[in-house]
Amino acid sequence: MSSLSQSPPPPEMDIQPPALVNDDPSTYSSALWDWGDLLDFAADERLLVDQIHFPPVLSPPLPPLIPTQTPAESELDPSPEESGSGSDRVRKRDPRLICSNFIEGMLPCSCPELDQKLEDAELPKKKRVRGGSGVARCQVPDCEADISELKGYHKRHRVCLRCATASFVVLDGENKRYCQQCGKFHLLPDFDEGKRSCRRKLERHNNRRKRKPVDKGGVAAEQQQVLSQNDNSVIDVEDGKDITCSSDQRAEEEPSLIFEDRHITTQGSVPFTRSINADNFVSVTGSGEAQPDEGMNDTKFERSPSNGDNKSAYSTVCPTGRISFKLYDWNPAEFPRRLRHQIFQWLANMPVELEGYIRPGCTILTVFIAMPEIMWAKLSKDPVAYLDEFILKPGKMLFGRGSMTVYLNNMIFRLIKGGTTLKRVDVKLESPKLQFVYPTCFEAGKPIELVVCGQNLLQPKCRFLVSFSGKYLPHNYSVVPAPDQDGKRSCNNKFYKINIVNSDPSLFGPAFVEVENESGLSNFIPLIIGDAAVCSEMKLIEQKFNATLFPEGQEVTACSSLTCCCRDFGERQSTFSGLLLDIAWSVKVPSAERTEQPVNRCQIKRYNRVLNYLIQNNSASILGNVLHNLETLVKKMEPDSLVHCTCDCDVRLLHENMDLASDIHRKHQSPIESKVNPPSSGCCCVSSQKDIPSRILNFNKDPEAGLDCKERIQADCSPDSGGKETDPLLNKEVVMNVNDIGDWPRKSCIKTHSALAFRSRQTMFLIATFAVCFAVCAVLYHPNKVTQLAVAIRMRLVHKI
């Protein structure tokens, strides 16, 4: 210990080291504050620093040092009298010796007092609550509700039910939200919108779900324990099971996450019944399993059956379906913008229409897309091959992203084994199913109230999704009691009423209604949102569809009449949805990305079919919206883009339909002219429908018609010409070359319409010519009389003025 005496003391301390006898610790002074001991420890600290910068100094060996204790465990050395034998006592380091203020010579050290003052200033009210009368109360200052009757979870974290489920509370002067996994209050920026768990916990949760299942529970349990310790998660032990949250937390958590946990981690979820209240679904998650095969009306892409010669019969060229990707590898708050742009760029290659929605949580991308029937047929025939081509092919944007779930209409596929194998999953029988929605047309900018009928809807974690114009509309929903007949229910379906407060009055287009619960995701039913005139005409069109299904003139007047005709309304909904979607897509204002893409034949055919149907039904207001969007779309395109995408006959037919629709819309705006020439009332399509059938009802019935265009249409529509069956579904060249399989006849009532319009114009021209000739003859042969007549008319006009 001689080297210690040579070491200089601190600048402000002039203390000599104590004399040691044979380096025996028992010979140290027994004083409580022995400055020799202090200098000894201070020298140790300086030696540790000196060894880094200077070479070691040769000195006799030092006695072994006692391990350093933490400030919480350190205490002063007791005297020999207090400890009994001096040789048996254990030396502990003074807690002040590790303080930088004390080492620098600032005596006395005031750090403990400052720390205590800071703690008292930070949490004065919490300490007051802890030191109260012993009654367990909520830690929120403005609440302090009695939680003694609640479960152990709420008592441990000192939070009541209202504060735990509130969107935010004021705590320490800031808006905070309770994290049901951490058991603490965090600032609002730490949460995603609508979430009850902080972003860090959700990311940890997703990482746990992505781990491969292990047969032997030892390794998995060890990894789970390490991950839980690193994450400081709150674990409740009840009945020998470890659960990361209480049942109240699971009620507020994301249903899709809990549903997937049931397959991956544990079966210990607690069922519950959720109260029906207002939910904001602007950035809502929720994608469960799909519905049974027989419950998906949007995946039946056969043509709708025609009912005789009724004009309301309609079959769509490009049915609308749903494709959804549930991605587990991306954090909701860190979803790459570039990748999202790539996904939408890929979707923009689809031939007709699309509407995409992204929900956080497990990053769920849902797309409602309209494609030709032949493409849906190929996709339904071999879905695994097409999905493998897009997901598992190197270089694709989803390649190597790990596990994911793909919902393709009424089918479910999961990417397993580290993202290398795509497997189809069976659909649960108790999955929800929507029968119909009434009404299906709503005016933009006004409150929306609709009735939903379906099966297996009221289950735990039930929520409705109403998507429109790229976002989910906030709404409230409630159960509607179905009336009984003779003490027995006439229908097993359940009825719900959905109230949407407001919507954008300037946005028109399709909306989609879905429902999800713990059993999965239902089918979707489309709606249309437009202005008052569009809604009025859509109601008339819907009444014609009702007339085809209810020959005796039954009408829908109230919710009480719906229970006795659930099946009939379901059939009407599936029949009417094709026309409704085609009209809704047509009245939607085209986006900037869509105007940059060339128009293909499927779009031309769809526009021709929609225009033809609306012309026959004299729907002038809808025609005005469709024409405005179609003209805007055509003007922004290249002049030759229409010619390159389809044959001349389709282009000529489109121009004829646009001209005729423009005339009808113009006559509808001028009532006087419409009375002289009533639109569509004199159309020979209606009067002579047996002689000259409509294109709507007879697309493939005249094999000899349209010989000049038939070969080109068949060449484009044949599967071999567009590509092989194994070609990628989302390949741009294949999509653009695939068209409807129907033949377009040359004979139609459009020429009759054109001839009628031409004859009316010729008649007006003859009348005008006769009047001009009569006036010229009168001037030439009777100039005096004409002069007198002109003077008389002039005098009368001057007199009146």
From Swiss-Prot:
Cofactor binding note: Binds 2 Zn(2+) ions per subunit.
Tissue: Expressed in roots rosette leaves, cauline leaves, stems, flowers and siliques.
SBP-type ZnF: 135-212
Region span, Disordered: 1-23, 59-91, 203-258, 286-313
Assigned GO CC terms: nuclear speck
Binding-site list for Zn(2+) 1: C138, C143, C160, C163
A GO term for molecular function: zinc ion binding
Binding site for Zn(2+) 2: C179, C182, H186, C198
InterPro entries: SBP-like, SBP_dom, SBP_sf
Basic residues: bias regions: 203-213
GO BP of this protein: cellular response to copper ion starvation; regulation of developmental growth; regulation of DNA-templated transcription
Biased composition (Polar residues): 222-233, 304-313
Biological role: Transcription factor that participates in reprogramming global gene expression during copper deficiency in order to improve the metal uptake and prioritize its distribution to copper proteins of major importance. Binds directly to 5'-GTAC-3' motifs in the microRNA (miRNA) promoter of the stress-responsive miRNAs miR398b and miR398c to activate their transcription. During copper deficiency, activates the copper transporters COPT1 and COPT2, and the copper chaperone CCH, directly or indirectly via miRNAs. Required for the expression of the miRNAs miR397, miR408 and miR857.
Quaternary structure annotation from Swiss-Prot or TrEMBL: Homodimer. Interacts with KIN17. Interacts with HY5.
Record-given protein name: Squamosa promoter-binding-like protein 7
Source organism (scientific name): Arabidopsis thaliana
Taxonomic lineage: Eukaryota, Viridiplantae, Streptophyta, Embryophyta, Tracheophyta
Gene that specifies this protein: SPL7
